[in-house]
């Protein structure tokens, strides 16, 4: 390994990269933190006719590229060990950018049968109805089913590393093999499993997508999305889906996410450790109908998760339900005094959201317990585990009093 140099990202360990990546000494002021550059236009050369007006590598117009988004892109590509990255205003914009860039009318896509609601609607309704792009929704825990779904026109396989919200774990190495045999791209939403915990590109995945709003920013105060992969693939995304469609991240959000990502390795260590403690408490609690978390031995993909994630942990997302009807779930949530009832995940504070049994697209493909009770999705934050457990126990006591 070369001597560490903060200007050479490949020479840095992950914690050092998280601190120094995307940060530059400002040449004008001498400030040792990259400033927020709130400009929509940048100075042109003497002869503008020499320019590529769609260039995304040098700042000219912030829809194409700006100083803060370039710094963030370089950092995220290095963190994921990819060649290049394209950042967007939201995670959904990043997902749409992949689909828009690489799919056309008549193409076929294989998608996980449990997936983020926006992805479900895109492939179940919008893309088939408006653009004649057909999708097959498949259990990503069943590789035989994935193979059987492949067609001559299959151009893309898309999955989440850990399904939202059921926590089913996809076998990424097996999917890489299937995609290569099919001549299809494999895109993976790794929002639940950010680096350094897991790097799908190292297994041969073509494109990795993150909602930067979640763990990578980690503070619940900025939105963004990113696609990371080879220079060739990311260039197409920038040229087609960024320059000509927009969805551009603001300089302020790019700066916030660059700053938030500094503490990512420290936050993940705390969140993953706390999640295992909380999950084991939930497993022991007889007032719950079910709990699902990859770190529990009875989870169907526990051994896959242990092997795939290299023993680094099992993430900080879980789902459970109180033994009762929907109003019982709502009463439980209302009795919590530390855990916050809100959407999103990966924040510094622990978040819980109650979703009814039929509350999301494709819910009929959820496990029977999810359909019967609905579910409470729990995103573990940075609080002390004993406080979270006490909060849950007290809320259960009040709910069943």
UniProtKB/Swiss-Prot annotation:
It is an enzyme of class 4 (lyase). Pfam families: Cys_Met_Meta_PP. PROSITE patterns: CYS_MET_METAB_PP (PS00868). One of its GO terms (biological process) is transsulfuration. Keywords: Lyase, Plasmid, Pyridoxal phosphate. GO terms for molecular function: carbon-sulfur lyase activity; pyridoxal phosphate binding. Its cofactor is pyridoxal 5'-phosphate. InterPro entries: Cys/Met-Metab_PyrdxlP-dep_enz, Cys_met_metab_PP, PyrdxlP-dep_Trfase, PyrdxlP-dep_Trfase_major, PyrdxlP-dep_Trfase_small. The keyword Lyase applies. The keyword Lyase applies. GO terms for cellular component: cytoplasm. It catalyses: L-canavanine + H2O = N-hydroxyguanidine + L-homoserine. Its EC number is 4.4.1.43. The modification N6-(pyridoxal phosphate)lysine is found at residue 214. SUPFAM superfamilies: PLP-dependent transferases. Lyase involved in the degradation of canavanine, the delta-oxa-analog of arginine, allowing growth on canavanine as sole nitrogen and carbon source. Catalyzes the elimination of hydroxyguanidine from canavanine with a subsequent water addition to yield homoserine. Belongs to the trans-sulfuration enzymes family. This is Canavanine gamma-lyase. It comes from Rhizobium leguminosarum bv. trifolii (strain WSM2304).
